[in-house]
Amino acid sequence: MIIIMDNGGQYVHRIWRTLRYLGVEAKIIPNTTPLDEIKAMKPKGIIFSGGPSLENTGNCEKILEHYEEFNVPILGICLGHQLIAKFFGGEVGRGEKAEYSLVEIEIIDENDIFKGLPRKVRVWESHMDEVKKLPPKFKLLARSDTCPVEAMKHEELPIYGVQFHPEVAHTEHGADILRNFAKICGEL
């Protein structure tokens, strides 16, 4: 099962629906769910959803603090991506302009999260803030003309972040990205 931490984003149910469509068991839980309850669910992976504010990410940061107790792949989407970057020492700030549109990203490193995708993909973005600088020990996976860090991965741990929304129908190959994450988790 993949746990989806609900950070109050408008697309959180789309993440769940896409995973279910792919045949993956998934569950949306409040981001305030205690760590012991999350551990008892024995997730194979965790997704940090998008949301309105880094100040309202509940226990997501605690999951990162206690990563060795979970030891499962993590995917941060939009706000979740920013949270991961900030936690590991990256820089998050306002973008040059708010993005609420389709953006073409360039995949720099196919990696396992983008396996089988073309080098350029149009994705849906819905954010004001963005990762301005990669955290130490992270690799850049994708970028765009409007955002320097569209996707990243920890060099040693299966921790990923994407600025865009793979769960939204407008994102080309979005279901493939979530399928690849489910494969990384051993759920497909």
Curated annotation (Swiss-Prot):
Location of the active site: C78, H165, E167
Signal peptide: none
SUPFAM superfamilies given in the database record: Class I glutamine amidotransferase-like
GO CC annotation: cytosol
Subunit field text: Heterodimer composed of a glutamine amidotransferase subunit (A) and a GMP-binding subunit (B).
Pathway of action: Purine metabolism; GMP biosynthesis; GMP from XMP (L-Gln route): step 1/1
Enzyme Commission no: 6.3.5.2
ATP-binding listed as a keyword: yes
Function field: Catalyzes the synthesis of GMP from XMP.
Domain of life: Archaea
Catalytic activity field: XMP + L-glutamine + ATP + H2O = GMP + L-glutamate + AMP + diphosphate + 2 H(+)
Entry annotated with the keyword Nucleotide-binding: yes
GO molecular function, one term: ATP binding
Full protein name: GMP synthase [glutamine-hydrolyzing] subunit A
Keywords: ATP-binding, Glutamine amidotransferase, GMP biosynthesis, Ligase, Nucleotide-binding, Purine biosynthesis
Glutamine amidotransferase type-1 domain location: 1-188
Matching Pfam families: GATase (PF00117)
